Amino acid sequence: MNAPTDYLLHLADNALILGQRNAEWCGHGPILEEDIALSNNSLDLIGQARMLYQHAAAQIGGEATEDTLAYFRDVPDFRNYTLCELPHMPLMSATAQGDRDFAMTMARNFLYSSLMVLVWDQLQSSKDPQLAAIAAKSLKEVRYHLRHSRDWLVRLGDGTDESHTKAQAALDQLLPYTQEFWASSPHEAEALANGTGIDIAALRNDWNQIVDEALLEATLQRPADGGFVPTGKQGIHSEHLGFVLAEMQSLARAHPQAVW
């Protein structure tokens, strides 16, 4: 049994867009080790996206490939969490798209990987055998992503006054976006019904425990969830996704028939 195509695209789009964001640190890391670590994180995520796009393309048929799904869909076609597409800087600051705040990046990676260790763990039991195999491989990678981002969040939160302030500001901005994790979507409901997906809302307590334990160690305060629920996985995105796709897709769209 195959998972619904839109469900596969949702998982793939999350990995691709966050992988693309983390790749923006290549050559700009605060220290060489972190430059390499974030580049490797990006490669892991894009590798996960490739496997999922290949699986989805096989179901779609025709001329669909992993490349057409990554490079020739437009903003409304993407089903990623809004959290994954946000820039690396506070949204209200007067900065350019290319500016980077390390605390923002680590906070986002922590919040996302805290979810995905739970998601991939459960998807190992999916009735879609190919998705289950992808989950088993991805789980090993995202466990490292969680450990890496958690260590940095604790280091920043329990560090200097400046690093604590930056970590708290990042958390205050990003954590409300995680409300989208638990909002229902048609493709998730369909995948759950046919046994290929999981009940994402059932993971909320375990995710909260992972987050709260880390914040306690980091001496950070958890902000209120807020009432706004982002709608990225329904195809309604922030303005930031357009900038990500414009850069990521430019070469493929300029030379659509090129063979590399």
What are these regions (language model features)?
Residues 4-8, 29-48, 105, 130-142:
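Alpha-helical scaffold segments that form or flank carboxylate-/histidine-based iron centers
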